[in-house]
Amino acid sequence: MTKRAKRPLLRRRVMIGPELWPRLAIFIILPSAALAQQDPAWPCAQRLVPSLSAGSFWPGQITSQPNWRDDDALFPLVTAVIDRDTPDDAATAKLSAYATPIPAARRPALFAALVDQTNDIRDVLIRRLIKLGRRQIAMGQTIAALSSKLDGLKPEDAARESLVGERDLDLRAFSETQHVMRYACEAPANMERRLGTFARLLLRK
């Protein structure tokens, strides 16, 4: 059964004036944080998955090899394959070239190393995103407080111009950070997707 697309409630575009932006700033990240349902500071629409399990991608038992970083051949391969700057096709080519000649019995340990490295990098990314989410929440509260102060001032009050300038600078910084976070939030999910690709490649060998 196919779901019917929801029709927009309003066909007419609703424009939000700049005077309303400060009051909306504190709520901008709340819907995505609510989707995470795990950490209120998680700023992404994507579900928060703190750590990836090898069993989610690989059938059967996989025993992690904690000393894989001491392997002079395996360590540089894993770091290159998992590196976010390595394009997908280059990463799969490197992994395929390494995995083709090795026995099938060694491939689970190879995949476990890929999972370890992925989790290490994702953990750093997730911590940074949560820290950024906390900063955005605090910034939204600051903007809302400045707006409340402005509401209590008369147009001719001397303090008004300074507060408006401060509020607008904070709002601009808030909006720019939100824009950057939309892209940064894709990184943990992209790493999870790539890990699934690597698992399928190794299982086909």
Regions found by a protein language model. Name each.
Residues M1-L20:
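N-terminal secretory signal peptides that target proteins for export/translocation
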Residues S32-A36:
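Sec/Tat signal peptide C-region and signal peptidase I cleavage site
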